[in-house]
Amino acid sequence: MSSWGRLSALPHEVIELADRAAVAAVLAHSRPGIAYGLGRSYGDACLNPGGTLWRTTGLDRLIDFDESTGRLVCEAGVVLRDIQDLFLPRGWGLPVLPGTRLVTVGGAIANDVHGKNHHQTGTFGDHVRSIRLQRTDGEAIVCGPAERADWFAATVGGLGLTGLIVEAELQLRRVPGPWLETETVAYAGLDEFFRLSDQSHPDWEHAVSWIDCTAGEAGRGLFLRARAAADQHGAWRGRQLSFPVVPPVSLVNRLTLGPLNRLFWWLNRRHLGRRIVHYQPFLFPLDAVADWNRAYGPAGFHQYQCVVPRENAADAIAGLLAAIAGSGDGSVLAVLKTFGDRWPPGLLSFARPGVTLALDFHNRAGIEALFERLDALVVAAGGRLYPAKDARMPRAVFEAGYPRLGEFMGYRDPGISSAMSRRLTGS
């Protein structure tokens, strides 16, 4: 079994969960384990080498839906894609969607995922009304913002470590349709990025940018923003491509990085200005290429995603970009975004107010030295790293970024363990 970063492929005992009534008995006889949905965590949050994975994709039932309020009760293995496909034609949709539709409800809660609209809608956990949690000792806990709120805060963003999420009640929202009015604006440096962010947040629901992190061009980028289109068009048929093989070496490396970034810049500059597009290619551009993670070759890749407080962001982001450009490493898919002012609901939720930078790095010998330099800059700025994307964060960096970790540990289920939990907490 492996995760999306393809950094390892190690043996696990995999137990398929298909009946929520039987979950308690399964957990009692197969611990320690960790829930595994679609495996879209990039690092080791969903892995337990030598131990058990409880695969939740069989817990895929919709239990109840209130058409008048948008309240949806479903099992934890339901995929966000399927909720969107079923309810969007009925005028409802999820308020928060991450960069891929291929995430389970349980995974979205456990990682408290965010989307391009964080500045207006917060994180996924902000729209969860209740969670049914199964502990490995047999206890079942129902928690929410107004019921056992302490357990809710520990479970949202809790990396699956407080118990197995069996089902959840979600609040959907009214949506006019699948079409978005979008605008792409080129910017020359970080000052322009911050100006565009501040200008966009009141009127544009979605806002994100691609930034060039290569030497000589670091700081230029393309700012993309979107909101519901006034006129909703007809049917849309997306093209599904696939990456058929794993190349012998990463196609993203020091030789190709500069040309790929220049190509990306040139291709997307052709689309400056406003257009009407379907929400899927805007919100989930990489979903159009199945198995795109194979492009990084047999060694896989790391994603490094951090958030730093807004008051320190200008210097911190400039320092991070300079360190990356100076190293000769970098990313074709470097994403820069400003989060909103809302604090997230979970004790270990990532998306705090500030500015987030995310980059993919092919896994090569010596890359850890760059990560250590980036870690130092993030910690000095008062920031933190995103556990859902992480496979190597030192324990000290985790503790510095998540000051409520000690409080969270009181809610740990001792029968649940992952490679990440052992690396970052010792158990």
Predicted feature locations:
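Noncatalytic alpha-helical scaffold of FAD-dependent oxidoreductases
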Residues: 1-427
